[in-house]
Regions:
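Positively charged n-region of N-terminal signal peptides that target proteins for export
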Residues: 1-5
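Bacterial N-terminal signal peptides
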Residues: 8-20
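Feature marking well-ordered beta-strand scaffolds used for ligand recognition
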Residues: 25-433
Length: 433
């Protein structure tokens, strides 16, 4: 969703500006409506986001609730690489890559004006390797995922952006910062809000594009430098985010199928995409308190799904972060079983589950880590946090946009709208297990 972000001021959503529009026109930069929404955001709010208190210390343990200037619990600060050292702009999404040859870990850092690549071999002193410029202008929404040592990058509100494909093995020989070019540009869509990849099958799902009614645009990326369109999921309209997996959960009817779990603005929508030419919607379920179904992630056993709603805090009277718990024992009948209410006041954005923990990027409240071992009874508990926006907590759009917790080293990388790359490491003994 296009959410206009203002520091300390009222939040205005693009949906409020375009109530009479279809989702496709509101998100398409080739329409007058989409252009108006983009101008409103870009002209009014990006400059204000750049002013934030950012610490510069490295290798600082969390002691008595602080690491340098940052509030924390059970998470140490390793380093901060500010936006000025990443190519400028504002931060957005982030992902990681581990070189299968050297074992080196790298951050892939989205920004309004491009994508930065950072060597994390020494996490207390990350090394900027260079920038892949945006294809056709700036965007506050850039997203990337990795498959077969290639990064696949999309951006919203840029009509000709398409999907950039970048061979990450090129980073092995970089000694000084470079300005890179993409290896391939897929032009089957222009803008896209997000991208998901099922690494097991080799299919990418570009979502919120100007095709497929805003639903998943499926691309075969098994040959990364030769992507080919494989299908569309358009039955339920605009999808904001998705997780697509080869299903191995409790519902025997769908085991072995490729299933997408879509956050579709006001529902959790589950789709069988095994046959890319003929996807089948399994279920579509709303929930009490829905304002904007944003993103979610499956537990490792694929029995439960944790969903974040991006607007329930700012529009509600209780501004605490909420996480919606779903029981997926039957994919045709998902059940919303409860809500976890965080002690922190903030909007949730992106979360990823690794083992028994959910790593949440919750804007002004920073990185929050939840123990999900009690998910069967909808009982979650916070075991750690690192607040990259120390100025305060509120249901506004500043701070942590996303995080990546899947490095074998145990470090977690966070991308802040105003802060840039923040590298941290949880200290509780069972982190990520």
């Amino acid at each position: 969703m296009k959410i206009v972000r203002m520091m300390g001021l009222a939040v205005l959503t693009a949906s409020a500006l375009v109530l009479s529009m279809t989702a496709a026109s509101a998100h398409d930069p080739d329409t007058a409506e989409g252009q108006a929404a983009a101008r409103t955001f870009m002209a009014d709010h990006i400059p204000a986001e750049r002013h934030a208190v950012t610490g510069t210390a490295a290798g600082v343990p969390c002691v008595n609730g602080k690491a340098d200037i940052y509030p924390c619990k059970n998470v140490d600060l390793l380093s901060v690489l500010p936006l000025s050292g990443l190519g400028g702009g504002n931060g957005n999404d982030i992902w990681g890559w581990t070189d299968p040859v050297s074992g080196k870990e790298y951050a892939i850092v989205g920004r309004t004006n491009g994508t930065a690549f950072v060597d994390l071999s020494t996490p207390t002193s990350p090394k900027f390797l260079g920038n892949l410029p945006s294809n056709g202008g700036s965007s506050s929404w850039r997203d990337m995922k990795v498959y077969k040592n290639h990064a696949f990058i999309v951006a919203d509100f840029i009509s000709g952006h398409g999907m950039q494909v970048f061979d990450l093995t090129r980073l092995r020989t970089v000694t000084t910062p470079q300005t890179f070019t993409a290896d391939t540009l897929y032009k089957g869509f222009g803008p896209a809000h997000n991208i998901a990849i099922n690494e097991e099958t080799g299919f990418a799902y570009a979502i919120g594009s100007n095709t497929c009614s805003g639903g998943p645009h499926i691309v075969n990326i098994q040959s990364p430098k030769a992507p080919v369109k494989a299908g569309c999921v358009s039955q339920d309209g605009y999808t904001h985010d998705t997780q697509c997996v080869v299903y191995r959960g409790p519902d025997a009817a769908y085991r072995g199928k490729e299933i997408c779990f879509n956050a579709n603005e006001d529902t959790l929508t589950i789709v069988d995409v095994t046959d890319k030419a003929r996807p089948v919607q399994i279920s579509r379920k709303g929930y009490s308190g829905a304002q904007y179904s944003h993103q979610g992630w499956l537990t490792d056993d694929q029995r439960y799904f944790l969903l974040d709603d991006e607007l329930d805090e700012s529009r509600g009277t209780d501004k605490r972060t909420k996480t919606y718990v779903w029981d997926l024992a039957k994919l045709s009948a998902p059940v919303h079983t409860g809500v976890y209410n965080s002690p922190a006041t903030a909007i949730d954005h992106n979360q990823y589950i690794k083992g028994r923990y959910s790593y949440q990027a919750n804007y002004q409240a920073g990185l929050r880590i939840l123990d999900v071992s009690g998910v069967a009874s909808a009982q979650l508990s916070e075991v750690g946090y690192f607040d990259i926006y120390p100025s305060g907590n509120a249901a506004n759009f500043n701070g942590a946009w996303s995080n990546y917790p899947y490095f074998s080293s145990g470090i977690v990388i966070v991308n802040g709208i105003e802060q840039g790359l923040v590298v941290v490491k949880p200290t509780f003994t069972t982190a990520g297990r």
